[in-house]
Amino acid sequence: MLYNWAAENPEKVKCIAGIYPVCNLSSYPGLNRAAPAYKMTESELEKNLHLHNPIDKLKPLAEARIPIFHIHGNVDRVVPLKLNSGIISKRYKLLGGKMQLTVPEGQGHNMWEGFFKCKELVDFVIYSSKENFNSDR
């Protein structure tokens, strides 16, 4: 939902920061579980997935030069790195967007303190939120 809102309102977004974020509805929570949030059946969501799936809605963000930072563990089985932050990183860079992906080794989808006390993420948000940051884009 975060990426969808940002893609529809890029002029209101300074940056996107995520801790093991869901970026691919097919991967998690799965179309059958995601469909009700979009007021659709699973088959309707599958047919219209390109309109709602964050990995398919990156172009407006790249065009607006919105920087992205994710921290995502390499052994996350709930929201797999490769199918979520990994795809976002690859596609966003191909669109010319700037993204930093930090991958802590041996971490999954858990409450590891390093996710929530990541100095790089905090610094990224503070820097990106500065009023004059828009001129840097």
Residue ranges and their predicted role:
Residues 13-14, 65, 99:
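Core-facing hydrophobic residues within beta-strands of well-ordered domains
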Residues 17-20, 71, 104-105:
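Alpha/beta-hydrolase-fold catalytic nucleophile elbow
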Residues 23-33, 66-67, 74, 78-79, ...:
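Alpha/beta-hydrolase
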Residues 1-10:
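Short glycine-enriched nucleophile-adjacent loop
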Residues 69, 77-78, 82-137:
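C-terminal catalytic histidine-bearing segment of alpha/beta-hydrolase fold enzymes
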Residues 13-15, 21-60:
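Mobile cap/lid helix-loop segments that gate and shape the active-site cleft of serine hydrolases
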